[in-house]
Regions:
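Acidic, metal-coordinating catalytic segment for phosphate/diphosphate chemistry
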Residues: 3-11, 15-198
Length: 199
């Protein structure tokens, strides 16, 4: 084959009793994906230096693993940093959403999610408990809302799906009728509070 199996799920299916998530992968499985991929990248001459150890590192709740390295496309090209991130298939749509569009759009979409009772990050969309303080961290052990596609995240939030090429800033976070979320009374109040906190 051309390298590691891009879906290591089959090897982990039976060992997922501890997880209530719809994705049975553990941090060890994510690490295994990276362990299979790195030798292929090194042998091709693409990966020229590792910045993290073989297993990479994950976030504290084990929702993904990251490996950082230095790559080079050819002998006469500049070196570039690469982050290889392995996410569970159950939350890949949130990871894709997080890494497309502008940082400003993502920041305001995440803030809109908070105003609507959700927590949105690259690790998934999570329904927050009632009366959860807007600025408080996401409670541990929340299962992500099932959103197989980016569009499902927008639908769950009651927002209009925005194509990645149109994700520029807060004016692109839209209600179903096309009205910018942040031009509404609730959105404007939340935006003012968020902007004050950023200063």
């Amino acid at each position: 084959g051309m390298g590691p199996d891009p879906n290591p799920r089959s090897s982990a299916e039976s060992s997922s009793a501890e997880s209530e998530s719809s994705d049975p992968l553990s941090r060890d499985d994510y690490t295994r994906v990276i362990e299979l991929l790195l030798p292929v990248l090194k042998a091709s001459g693409y990966l020229v230096h590792e910045l993290t150890g073989m297993g990479g590192f994950g976030n504290p709740d084990g929702t993904h693993t990251t490996h950082m390295g230095i790559v080079r496309l050819g002998p006469d090209t500049q070196h570039r940093r690469i982050d290889i991130k392995v996410y569970p298939s159950a939350t890949i749509s949130a990871a894709i959403l997080h890494f497309t569009g502008s940082a400003q759009f993502n920041r305001f979409l995440s803030r809109a999610a908070r105003e609507l009772g959700y927590y949105l990050s690259s690790d998934g969309l999570f329904k927050l408990p009632p009366n959860h303080p807007t600025r408080a961290p996401r409670p541990p052990n929340l299962a992500p809302v099932r959103c197989p596609e980016e569009r499902d995240i927008f639908d769950q939030l009651g927002l209009l799906y925005v194509e990645p090429t149109r994700r520029k800033d807060k004016s692109d976070v839209l209600l179903p009728d096309g009205t910018p979320f942040w031009s509404t009374k609730a959105g404007a109040a939340a935006g003012a509070a968020a902007n004050t906190a950023l200063r």
